[in-house]
């Protein structure tokens, strides 16, 4: 399913490389909303999924799990761009900024706690001292 074209459910979307790549290119990021039914059926994302061709990079695969790198190559209008991302955003060697951490916390906690309680909890969490 990782490389497969099917994405009918949120679970399938989370494990479909074609879907998450097409979503990132279409919407700029892959956040919680990416797995809502309306997004899973977004025509622009679906059209782009057909053009995504995932493959395993043997060199990068050999470094897993020590390193979680990814390489992406995009060809558009006859031009090819390639990028190597040696680590995932949010890993210890490429941490989220405080603002990114706040946004992620509120995005995930607000549906469960409510917006006001999530904001209140976030303020309290930032006041905790680490030992």
What are the residue ranges of the model-derived segments?
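Terminal-appendage/accessory-domain detector
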Residues: 1-131
């Amino acid at each position: 399913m990782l490389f497969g074209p099917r994405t009918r459910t949120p679970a399938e979307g989370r494990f479909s490389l074609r879907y998450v790549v097409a979503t990132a290119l279409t919407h700029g990021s892959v956040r919680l909303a990416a797995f809502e039914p309306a997004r899973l059926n977004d025509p622009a994302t679906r059209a782009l999924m057909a053009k995504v061709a995932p493959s395993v990079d043997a060199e990068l695969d050999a470094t897993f799990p020590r390193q979680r790198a990814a390489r992406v190559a995009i060809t558009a209008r006859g031009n090819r761009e390639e990028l190597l991302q040696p680590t995932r955003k949010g890993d210890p060697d490429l941490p989220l900024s405080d603002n990114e951490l706040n946004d992620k916390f509120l995005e995930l906690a607000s549906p469960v706690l409510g917006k006001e309680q999530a904001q209140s909890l976030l303020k309290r969490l930032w006041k905790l001292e680490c030992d």
